Every structure is written in C-alpha cells, then in structure tokens.
Amino acid sequence: MKKNRLSFWLLLPCFVGMMLLCGKNMLEHPLTTSLKTSSQPTFVQKWYTALQMQLGNRQRNGVYIGETALYALPQPLSETALSDTADVINQFYQETELPICVTAIPDAASFYSDAFPDGMPYVEQKPAIKQFYNAIDLHIRKTDAYYILEAESNDYIYYRTFPYWTSYGAYSVYRSVIQKLGFVPISYDHYTVSHVKSDARGALYQATQTDAVMPDLIDVYENNSNPLTCTVTTTLQDGSKKERDSLYDADALQTENPYQFYLGEPAPLQVVTTNVQNGKKLLVI
C-alpha cells in the first residue's frame, strides 16, 4: 500500500502536466474527482484548488473564492423553516408577553454580490427575510439588519474565511437592537479592541484550502469604564455541565475552529451570570 502511494506522488507532476495540456475536460477524470475530497492530504487539496483557479474555476465545495474574501454560495432560504420559526416566536410572545426583538442576519454574499462574476446564478435572501418579518406578530419589535449592515459594508463586518459576521458587524446591529429593548447602547469609543488572534482561518478556508485570501482577526471588545466579570455555565448535549470564569474560551484559539473562542463549543444551553446588578435577564436564541 505504501509503495502504491509513493508511486502516485511520483506520478503527480506528470498528471499536472497532462491536466494543463488537456484543459478543463481533464477535471472530470476519476483521479481528479478523488482529489476534490477533504480526505486527501492538505497540500494536495491546496494544489487542486490552485489548479482550478488557474483554469478559471473559483468555486469549490460550495464556496466562491473572491479576490479579498471567501463566500458561501448563496442558498435559498426555506420558506417552511422561516414560517415555523415565526410561529414559535409568536407563540412565545403570546405566552409570556415579554419584550422581544427579532433580527435576521443575511449572509455576506447579500452585501458583496459584485464579487461574483456576471452571469453566475445568485440567490437573493432579502425577499425571504422580509416575508419572515411580515409573519411575526406586530407587537414584536423587529430590527432589519440588512440596511444597518449595508451602510457599514465598507468596513470589516463579515469574516473573510468564516461564514459569520465579525464583532464589529454584530456591534453595528446591537446599537439598534438594544435601543428597541429600551436601553442606551454603549458608545464604540468606550471600548478597547484587542486582536487575540490575527491568523484565524475558518470553515470557508477549510472547504477551499486556498491561501489567496488573508486570514481573519479574532477581536475582543472590552468596556474600560465598566469592566465585566462573569461566569458561564454550559449544559452539554449529554446533560453534563461545564463552568468557566470568562465569556471567552481561550483554548479554542488553538483549534481548527477558533471562532468557538466566542462562548465556546455549541451547546443546548448557556447561562451567563455577570456582575451587573440591575435585576434584569436577557434571553438570546
């Protein structure tokens, strides 16, 4: 088996030359198809992505490789899922009558469609999100994040290699959401922003294995005028609990998913207890 693998790597340069000579049709060869899988060594995946880009194909594993960022190819939002979600929110409000603010966050492609080539199929999420808002009870506050983020689209509001918004993108929307909940937003000037990781690469990078796009920054916002101390109790899928004395999970910065630095690994329930003594509770779903 080892001998066969060695033979493959020795023949790889010849295979590269054949692909360059034969053009895109060679990409349908069974051997080429096997190179598309994530089970291949990382350097093979990097080589395959680079080759595709040389041949003009900037898509891989559902991700488009832009000039400055990676984008998950836009997918249509499920009308059934949106309708079911709206029904659950409405029912929760009817049972509790608690003040609620709902915000739907579009994907990055919604704001950077000019990064895609002309003629490429594109799914616009805005109409589906509008329909979702219309299905929510009129007594529930809604914040249309689309217009807020669109106004900030020249700034670093979405990660380049993760399918998420950045801390600044979230802060931009927070300013509107918190006002609708009856609070005064904390001014950006009151925060000190620290880069806890400057070479973060996320799921979009893992899907493409391309170094053509700069890595991301993982930031922490600290309010100097009112330092926050807290404990986080996490209930895991198996019912067990873990506790830490920080909102952040520093160990995650050394893993393949450094985004889990924020709040830690996915879990059904997390309870954050802070030093704020105002008698109020906030439920985030």
Locate the predicted segments by residue.
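Extracellular glycan-modifying ectodomains
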Residues: 1-285
